[in-house]
């Protein structure tokens, strides 16, 4: 690592973190836009929120611009198109259950014919404003609820009685779109995962005329779904296990590891297993995102020194040199030193200081690159689009998810498992009671 980076990173990161948090006022000249794809399941979920959002937008942002693309962007993280589509269907089903979106029990990708019919309906309709958004929601419902008969009827009417319309707030493009997103003030917000952040921003700038009520079952950081002592004991007795696959040069890895260790592991009696991954250039990250996550989770952050490939390798070496039963605490200390104390573990003096703090008289002779490559392979087998990858095992079931946007699933899964357990027990009790009544 260069001397400039080692010296300047801690200073710059501390300044960035401590600078006044007054939000810049984002420009409104371009209004608010939403980018959708008819064959994108996240767009289906997003479309269900648009009529309500339009209703509370100030006149300054009306009408909401709807940009519909017919081109999918390349799948992330080297996933195949089929893997990505299946991941999206599974993930959207989880989101729909959590936030009570409309969703089919057995979702399927819409057919090419249905997509073509839907596009004609939306291009030809004379409806505008909120009326168009309700039609858009209905069309998405027909596509994703497999209501192809209704869609054909609407298509026939649109083809015979309407002509192609041209409205500035309704645009059809072939610009690649991976998943639905909003654009405001030259910033992008995920269509579902960032909707609350977007509405907070709009409310802050006094661009909403009413209180936004979206994602009512959203689980906030440091908010526990389970607080009843009896229910908590039941989860703890199930001995949940959580695997984390993390990139050591990524600050999100530190923030989520610290959050899970400090806030969830002891509370729910979760056994953690950590799998460091080989360096993948994630030290080039969004400083603003990491800072926001730190402040929302309450996890310490900065001054840091972004690890390069050699520093990440040395972090893994230290981790592997510690006895297995001490490795969770050891990696916590290693990442804490890098991300809150500004240590550069590619620098000999810093490395030796960390080695001494961990009480290591000698280092592991293990092939670290081979160890990391094996972790990489197991991580890739999970077919997830982003890092960190998490796998939760509980009550004989395994649940795989990823990234800071899905940490809430840990609490949600616990709650769902308990709910299902109580349903089964209640059904068994009713059956027993009915049998006894029949005998009597």
Residue ranges and their predicted role:
Residues 172, 187-188, 249, 308-311:
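Aromatic-acidic/polar surface patches that form glycan- and anion
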Residues 38, 42-142, 254-341, 421, ...:
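Structural alpha/beta surface segment adjacent to cysteine/selenocysteine redox centers
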Residues 3-7, 11-14, 28-34, 43-56, ...:
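C-terminal cap of thioredoxin/glutaredoxin-like
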Residues 36-39, 246-249:
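Short pre-active-site segment immediately N-terminal to redox-active cysteine/selenocysteine motifs
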Residues 20-27, 230-238:
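Short boundary motifs at domain starts and secondary-structure transition points
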Residues 66-69, 194, 247, 277, ...:
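An acidic- and aromatic-residue-enriched active-site/binding cleft used to recognize and process polar
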Residues 86-94, 231-241, 296-297, 372-375:
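A broadly tuned preference for mixed-charge, low-complexity surface segments
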Residues 81-84, 88, 160, 249, ...:
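Residue-level preference for long, well-ordered alpha-helices that form the structural scaffold
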